[in-house]
Amino acid sequence: MLGGDTGNIDNKKNNKMIYILYGQPASGKTTLGTMLAEHLDTPFVIDGDEFREMFTNKNYGRAGREENIRNANAVATYLNKKGERDDWSAIYCKKDGGNSIQGRPVKEGTDVVMCLVNPYEGLREELKNNNQDKVFEVFLKSNRDLRKDYHVEDFEVGNPDHLLNTDEEIEETWDRLKELLKI
């Protein structure tokens, strides 16, 4: 643990959250993010490589990374907040007095898992400021020498909620992540 804001983890786990798993390439972000999404039963995983492939931005310099991260942050915020607006519930739920739209339950937001290199603390802070008490950061660290060509020299670790070394077997790392997230 790095001393991030872990005091409100119990409040966070009762809300639909945006989980950021970030770190250098090949640190296990996608593998752990997919496992986390399955555990949370959410279809929303924003994987940096897949996300980049959807757009024309192939720039791995600072400007390209910032653009990609800002776009991912906007999508994560949208997905997380979708369905939690009071006016939506008020308009569509008045007829039957329940919490449904044509028999379908209204969601109270959605968990979103982000698996990005995300090297810039300011962009992670921007996401947290736009989603008060709904963002949980885990910095994934690995000593493996994979995909070094894509490593970011000016990586800003910042002050995440937790630091997780991913050099162990995936099952051990997954167990530690669940323990950190209290899920």
What are these language model-derived features?
Residues 24:
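P-loop (Walker A) phosphate-binding loop of NTP-binding proteins
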Residues 34-74:
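Conserved substrate/cofactor phosphate-moiety recognition/catalytic segment
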Residues 30:
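Walker A/P-loop
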Residues 115, 131-145:
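Conserved phosphate-donor/acceptor-positioning beta-strand/loop module used by diverse small-molecule
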Residues 21:
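Hydrophobic anchor at the beta1->P-loop junction of P-loop NTPases
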Residues 66-131:
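Glycine-rich phosphate-binding loop used to anchor ATP phosphates in small-molecule kinases
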